Amino acid sequence: MSSPKPPRRPAPPPGLLIVDKPAGMTSHDVVARARRIMGTRKVGHAGTLDPMATGVLVLGIERATKLLGHLALDRKTYLATLSLGSSTTTDDAEGEVLTTGDTEKITDDEIAEGVAKLTGDIQQVPSAVSAVKIDGKRAYARVRAGEDVVIPARPVTVYRFDVLGIRHEDDHVEVDAVVECSSGTYVRALARDLGADLGCGGHLKALRRTTVGPFTLARARTLDQLEETPELSLDLDAAVAAAFPRRDLDAATAKAVRHGQRIPAAGLDGTYGLFGPDGRVLALAADEQGVSRAVVVLLPA
């Protein structure tokens, strides 16, 4: 007789995991491991970190995957190390060296002036090896296929580009910096452009994301820590409360939402969370033509 199958592991509760991604893993690698740790296929990630980068990566579990496309993650902060003296095919340390330049006479003041030019509202050409789509195909896929890629500049905002330290080495200069920027900004492109401005070439040596939207490293856990204690960083109610404006409903209005009925507009900008009198989230909603329209229903099926 065949042995009976082990009981199926119950699905985890819905919510967010704030992961401190290690270097060398893709964002999809992190999702795959989180699926195993949490015992569910229903895991997704918001935003992407390059394999060389570390730091904050937001994962949705179970019904919380519905939140991922609506999270306001348009402001991000990084700790970066820029290497001046060589440019690479990928604008980071993983690419092949394209050019080298003399850094012996570059001064700290010149570096500060170059950084200032890259602060504020700027036009940035994304890195050629990036996920930007050109005629429906990712730029990195075109590069790997041997195509010459020309990506148009696009507007981004660099809110902060603060130099923390400068080290003059024998054949290059390393710059440690804090970069706070809008979504779509490539920090490795900042390194490339700083090196180009100084006439020596530049690339990104190291990158650590410390914040994305309202989520910070202070709440992040490593994958090894999650293995030991596979618990959510934020349950579904706490996740919505942390990431969206909140609208609390009385019992009658909450009942109307549960039955798919329209309720009056909230007078709030953008997407907000609808919470019942018990503090549980019912849906994400947005005002539209005088009513509150559900954008994502978060009630269990």
Task: Kindly label every feature range from the protein language model.
Residues 88, 120, 152, 166-170, ...:
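Short, conserved beta-turn/loop elements at beta-strand boundaries and strand-helix junctions
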